[in-house]
Amino acid sequence: MKRGRPAALRCLLLLRAPALLLLLRAAAVQGDCGPLPVVPRAHPASASAGSTSFPENTTVLYTCDQGFVKIPGKPDAVVCISSRWTDIEEFCNRSCEVPPRLPYAILKSAYISKNYFPVDTVVEYECRPGYRKKYPIQSGKITCRDDLTWSTPAEFCEKKQCPNPGELVNGNINVTTDLLLGSQIFFSCDPGYRLTGEASAFCMIKGNAVGWSSSLPTCIKIICPEPPQIENGRIVNEEDTYEYRHVVTYECNKGFVLTGKSHISCIVRDDVGEWSDPPPTCRVKSPPVIPPQKPTTTSAPGTTTTLPTQKPTTVNTAGPEVPTTQRSTTVNVPGTKVPTTQRSTTVNVPGTEVPTTWKSTTVNVPAAGNRPDTRTTIKSTTASEEKDLASGYRTFLYGVGVGVPVIVCSLGLGVYWWIHRTSGQYETYENKESNVICHNLNESDATSEITSSDKLKKTHVYKVDSFACGASNHWLADIAKEDLRRDFSNAQNISSLLQVLGAAQTQ
């Protein structure tokens, strides 16, 4: 009996085991879901994708594989409900990327929110604000191609143009490119004007149109401040306002000298009017300062007397012995010094020159005795070292005044000798050869010559034997007397002139 109980128990246990397993299994899967369904071109996104059992109400999300995009409107998740997964369709497909952004156009509103663009999908653009369609009208559509790229769009829009900005009075508008959307223009004023407002403007979008970012500026005339007044002077033609480039002229009162610029101009610096230079000043006029001067030499031309050409005739006549030959007398008369800052002025006054171009003719007349020739030489007086032309001229006159008496004395001695000689000599000019022949004058070596200076010479010498020709030879004495009378008269005139000048200088 004891051996039979264990066997029976074992059989009973073996019979009850499958039932227990079935009971246990039924209790485990009741309300749970099994493995996730397979979705083409997608895979579960959760980490529990490898699980085989999912509790009730479990939701599993799928994600499209690489290169595919979710088809809009199709579910991409499954839910465990009553031990079953909800149905799911293929929701992933190939698609182009979002259409490109164009600078001149945007997608129409129907395509803006989409992200699924399968092959052969067509989208359409419209012009952006500030642009307009070109004419003839071109298409603004593009297509998703088989290689999942978009077709190249045509540039079917162009920029709108801003209106003409107008004219800037007393200024200029510089258009660098054009007047289309996005362009910029610059404003500037003419010289002498200041710009008030914006210096530039942009062509920008204003609503559905385009316009300038700012209005035209204005150019205002620049005015300089009142010119400064000066002491002891005034402004010539003074005005109320002084504009750009206006010139102001100054002048000084009588007795004053202007120092500085007499003219100043209204200029513009940093859009502000100002004067080009400081005003001048007026100072008291000072006596003029005479600068040192180099010596000035002035030559006063002399008087040249031309006598008719005559041949000299020499007549030998006996007379008393004549005193010995006198030496030349030179008289230097110092000039009067005048205080001055100038250097000395030298005045050279040439003497009177009488041409001596005659050839001498010597005729000898028998005489009681031959006397040695007497030669008298008187040199002219020279005046120099004068300070100016006037003092030089006076010095010259003083020299003449001293020299003329010497000449007169010499002539007096000659006259004395002429009158008292028994056999003498006389100088004159003779043109008539018949007179000489009439008196049978013979050539003789003994001659007498009177020379006034190197500029005044008499070379006609007559030698007469006590005027033996008688009454017919009185012409010799008459000629001699006439010459002496003329020389003495000239000497008296010069002496009188010197006395008058001396009296004037004394005063």
Swiss-Prot record:
Residues 32-94, 95-159, 160-221, 222-284 form the Sushi domain. Pfam families: Sushi (PF00084). GO terms for biological process: complement activation, classical pathway; innate immune response; negative regulation of complement activation. Gene3D superfamilies: Complement Module, domain 1. Disulfide bonds join C33-C80, C64-C92, C96-C144, C127-C157, C162-C203, C189-C219, C224-C266, C252-C282. Residues 281-356 are annotated as: Disordered. Residues 295-317 have a biased composition (Low complexity). Glycans are attached at N57, N93, N174, N442, N493. All the isoforms are widely expressed. GPI and TCS are the major forms, whereas SEC is minor and TCL is only present in trace levels. One of its GO terms (cellular component) is side of membrane. SMART domains: CCP. Residues 1-31 form the signal peptide. Residues 323-356 have a biased composition (Polar residues). This protein recognizes C4b and C3b fragments that condense with cell-surface hydroxyl or amino groups when nascent C4b and C3b are locally generated during C4 and c3 activation. Interaction of daf with cell-associated C4b and C3b polypeptides interferes with their ability to catalyze the conversion of C2 and factor B to enzymatically active C2a and Bb and thereby prevents the formation of C4b2a and C3bBb, the amplification convertases of the complement cascade. Monomer (major form) and non-disulfide-linked, covalent homodimer (minor form). Interacts with ADGRE5. Belongs to the receptors of complement activation (RCA) family. This is Complement decay-accelerating factor. The lineage of its organism: Eukaryota, Metazoa, Chordata, Craniata, Vertebrata.
